[in-house]
Amino acid sequence: MEEINKYIQNSSETGGEIYNLIEELFPICRSITGNGVRKTMDIIRKHIPLEIHEVKSGTKVFDWTVPKEWNIKDAYVRNSKGEKVIDFKENNLHVMSYSVPVHKTMTLDELKPYLHTIPGNKDRIPYLTSYYKENWGFSLTQNKFDELCDDDYEVVIDSSLEDGSLTYGEYYIRGELEEEILLTTYTCHPSMCNDNLSGVALITFIAKALSKLKTKYSYRFLFAPETIGSITWLSRNEDKLKNIKMGLVATCVGDAGIKNYKRTKFGDAEIDKIVEKVLMHCGSEYYVADFFPWGSDERQFSSPGINLPVGSLMRSCYGFDGYHTSADNLCYMNKDGLADSYKTYLEVIYTIENNRTYLNLNPKCEPQLGKRGIYRMIGGGSDYPFDEFAMFWVLNMSDGKNSLLDIAYKSGMEFRRIKYAADALYRVELLKLV
Amino acid sequence: MEEINKYIQNSSETGGEIYNLIEELFPICRSITGNGVRKTMDIIRKHIPLEIHEVKSGTKVFDWTVPKEWNIKDAYVRNSKGEKVIDFKENNLHVMSYSVPVHKTMTLDELKPYLHTIPGNKDRIPYLTSYYKENWGFSLTQNKFDELCDDDYEVVIDSSLEDGSLTYGEYYIRGELEEEILLTTYTCHPSMCNDNLSGVALITFIAKALSKLKTKYSYRFLFAPETIGSITWLSRNEDKLKNIKMGLVATCVGDAGIKNYKRTKFGDAEIDKIVEKVLMHCGSEYYVADFFPWGSDERQFSSPGINLPVGSLMRSCYGFDGYHTSADNLCYMNKDGLADSYKTYLEVIYTIENNRTYLNLNPKCEPQLGKRGIYRMIGGGSDYPFDEFAMFWVLNMSDGKNSLLDIAYKSGMEFRRIKYAADALYRVELLKLV
Amino acid sequence: MEEINKYIQNSSETGGEIYNLIEELFPICRSITGNGVRKTMDIIRKHIPLEIHEVKSGTKVFDWTVPKEWNIKDAYVRNSKGEKVIDFKENNLHVMSYSVPVHKTMTLDELKPYLHTIPGNKDRIPYLTSYYKENWGFSLTQNKFDELCDDDYEVVIDSSLEDGSLTYGEYYIRGELEEEILLTTYTCHPSMCNDNLSGVALITFIAKALSKLKTKYSYRFLFAPETIGSITWLSRNEDKLKNIKMGLVATCVGDAGIKNYKRTKFGDAEIDKIVEKVLMHCGSEYYVADFFPWGSDERQFSSPGINLPVGSLMRSCYGFDGYHTSADNLCYMNKDGLADSYKTYLEVIYTIENNRTYLNLNPKCEPQLGKRGIYRMIGGGSDYPFDEFAMFWVLNMSDGKNSLLDIAYKSGMEFRRIKYAADALYRVELLKLV
């Protein structure tokens, strides 16, 4: 898996490509079902051969039921002068997701209970949903709301809520082993970038890179609506769960903030140790949070009956300034941040792929490295052509139980440094793979 | 056990009642045996139906022997002018506890070896005892000592040290379970308040409150002389120890200082976790100390052959300024401190009673809380009518092994918050009691 | 083992004697083999009856082979005026250890690749070796190097590298038990003091002291060349390893720096806890480092196929300013540092010898210490003739599993204080040895 380094080295360039994909997906009005999701999948399929699944409305998925499919053509509020004072075509956040069809004339007072704003941030449109209770509503900025005067308003939501299906995409890469790594992201949010077109685009490019590499583990990429999508996938794939070794949920990975890792519920699972080791040596600031049982789809993967070690590697965590509003737009995206997220995910995968456990074949005292050509020849000086410190750690700890990651932790050294030392020792047959 | 909240809410008022009981008990001259203890028990019995036990002098109790009973009518030192320069009737600390009878005339020089003062605190009378070696003595302030002139002094201790018995009181409340909680305090100190009329009075009122409630656990309240009393009780009740789930020793609970918890010898027993969780959220400063094998009766409960998880929840720990002197008087008592100690003990009992373990009956992914009416209906906003964060913690961790207390610790939330969330989930049949 | 205290009390005087031995050994040119080592052993044998072992060149020792024996009579570089510009007789560091014989005339340019200096410390001669590759070289100060002018130089190394043997010394003291404590030091360094004549001389005097005492454990002292010496010993004594309970490598123990303990690979072995407890109460500053798999012979003892709990108790760790140069000379030695190292090693041995585990024979409640004459007779005061606090800790924790060291840790008390309390309790038959 040294070939992945090529992708890591090109991450800066890839940051731009990820941004371009976000830009292409931005205008589409997505929800947990509907044609917006299908359009999104079509675009992703230009990069990776996503397999599309459609699950019928009414299907029972654990405690939940797949809802009706929602589609929307247009929506507006028009005043008596014929001016659209709220217009879905300007910003699809203006309509509460899953709004039922409406066509009536209402006074301002009648309309007000259906209008939602953020009084404390007067220029942002809030993002609202009502998936499981029939309802309708408009979101708008407080500024626009304040300009509305008494009038008779024509209120139109040209939507449909009918039996249909829930759409999700899946891409599976078979590696040398059946054991698999699960990388998921969610596709249900309309025109917002960090949450979560950034995750969608990042996972697309990670999958694209891995599709060109020979991997030890198998990889599964899941693009599904949040909550109901992961629940649907889990309820249909219980037989596959035994193969999942670890996973990550990708969300909020495109902004300029520092990297932010939310641990699995176990707190010290292999994926936790891997991500934290990568972050420790990443050279920039980061934050690690313990698991909490809300947030994104790690909630479902971590429920006591599923219990998978799934963490979430983000930049600014959900709840950032502008979260779930029109402020989470293309301006909030940062190409360097996207590139760094891409690089970090690849470093994590590099570590997953290379975390082997060896047995020292010369366990009694140190082997004589010099006669094998991997040790300095003049003692006492300070000229160290070989990384003997890392080699000594690997030799000392390779009792068949400690992995290279364990050795990296104990020594305080970067995983790669330990890995390269192990490679050198393996080449001269001082190590055996366990 | 939500009814206990009524007592918690009224703790401020109860603080005053506890103070009144201390005031009533203050003048009595107690020791490890004798009529002062019996008088004390009679007064406590006005509040709770204490069962009184008398254990004969000479009875073997483990390595110890119940000593002779000591009683005292009067004691003084009178100068040649007929003035009582030391008078037991002024303060019963003037006489060393267990002083044998004396009636002789002595010069000052002869008397001096029997006079005890605190040179560094000239206005305090020290509290001294000589239970296990026949001896006699007077305590007085250094100031008074300094005024004594050469003279012939009449020295009188009108005491008796004879076969009799050791008196202790016990009150047992049978709960739903045979498993019991032990709350002990000691009754052997003469006129000193924080050590330990505060403990005696507090436990009286805790027992009074619990006597009116239906409890899950049984409760045993022990009022006995320190050391010899708890040893006596333990030696006579070895068969009961298997039922004791945990316990607390109440002492020094009446002053204005911060709360102070001395852990059990185990350091992380359930009672430790409960008391510390209550303290964490008490809103005021507190201190937690690891176990040390001196102090009060937790020494006996923690001996290697008894090994019970018994901690001690105090305010200013023994050794406070004025400890074991006449300065530990009614002025040292603080009604707010007493009220807060009462409230804290009740909060601990609330937590003991409600610390259940549940099993999530819908373990695969999250259950749909909305369809059960315990979840907000519009997503994305910030209006949270239900405590979904606490509910998510309970659902995520209720695998039949984690108790509500464990969940409270992991989540960082107050125990009550977790408990109420579990109640809500239990009502809609998402949880089963383990 | 209270008799060891006499040696501890005299440590200041012994510091001077250790210094004198260093001074006597300093001029000798040692290497990993050769007559310098033999001469060193002869001098040590004036203090302790060291058994000398000779292992033939060519002997296989695990992955290594005992090298040819190296001896040197003289070496110099002489300019055309007949002046010795580099002279082995002035300082034996001038010749790279294991230099093959040389006799030729060379220009400065031809000679330069064989000259080694420390450019950043112009007045120090570096210490260099080439044990396993035939090579030769001279070390000199940068200052001297800078003075060399173009000339024809006569280059002479009058050495021999021939089949012979590797010499090591061993001294074994049989104690009451077969279980043994291993104390090792290395003898291969030429004229340098802290590294490692300080270790050689210290271990000599520790062995000298123990030879006069009756010990519980057996003690083995090893004086061997670093790396190849300990490997040789280990390969010839595999059957003895099962008896080794713990060990220490003595090196760099003679300077004025603070004490420095490098933990065993286990990190919490008994020797780690003992040394750290001694250091905690030593009254001066110290440092504790986790194990790392380079340094001295603890590397070999800690290899995965040997796995012995061997730490290293030093003062300034290798790598100190002047390390492996001519600056590590007699001026770098400090008699107080030597005395303190000696004292500390003896305190460690005192703790090893006395770390017993007892069973409290009166486990139910506290025993009545007063009736056994080991408790104050008047309660309440502050006169504590007996160390009841330490006795309470011993009684409380002596359940047959906790050692005195465990009790010392839990109580925060010095090991001696706990040991003396246990002695008092043992005398009155309250404890039984486990």
Swiss-Prot record, chains A, B, C:
CDD domains, alphabetized: M28_like
Keywords: Carbohydrate metabolism, Metal-binding, Zinc
Superkingdom assignment: Bacteria
InterPro entries in alphabetical order: DUF2172, DUF4910, UCP015244, UCP01524_HTH, WH-like_DNA-bd_sf
Cofactor(s) required for function per UniProt: Zn(2+)
Chain spans, region Aminopeptidase-like: 1-55, 57-355
SUPFAM superfamilies linked: Zn-dependent exopeptidases
Region (Insert): 56-164
Amino-acid positions noted as binding Zn(2+) in the UniProt annotation, renumbered to this chain: 189, 195, 324
Cofactor note text: Binds 1 zinc ion per subunit.
Pfam families, sorted: DUF2172 (PF09940), DUF4910 (PF16254), HTH_47 (PF16221)
Region (Permutated winged helix-turn-helix): 356-434
Gene3D superfamilies: 3.50.30.90, Winged helix-like DNA-binding domain superfamily/Winged helix DNA-binding domain, Zn peptidases
GO terms for MF: metal ion binding
Family under the similarity heading: Belongs to the UPF0770 family.
Subunit structure: Homotrimer.
Protein function: The genomic context suggests a role in the biosynthesis of modified polysaccharides; this association with genes involved in carbohydrate metabolism is observed in several phylogenetically distinct taxa. Is not expected to have peptidase activity despite low similarity to aminopeptidases.
Record remark on domains: Contains an N-terminal region with low similarity to aminopeptidases, an insert domain, and a C-terminal permutated winged helix-turn-helix domain.
Protein name as catalogued: Putative polysaccharide biosynthesis protein with aminopeptidase-like domain
Source organism phylogeny: Bacteria, Bacillati, Bacillota, Clostridia, Eubacteriales
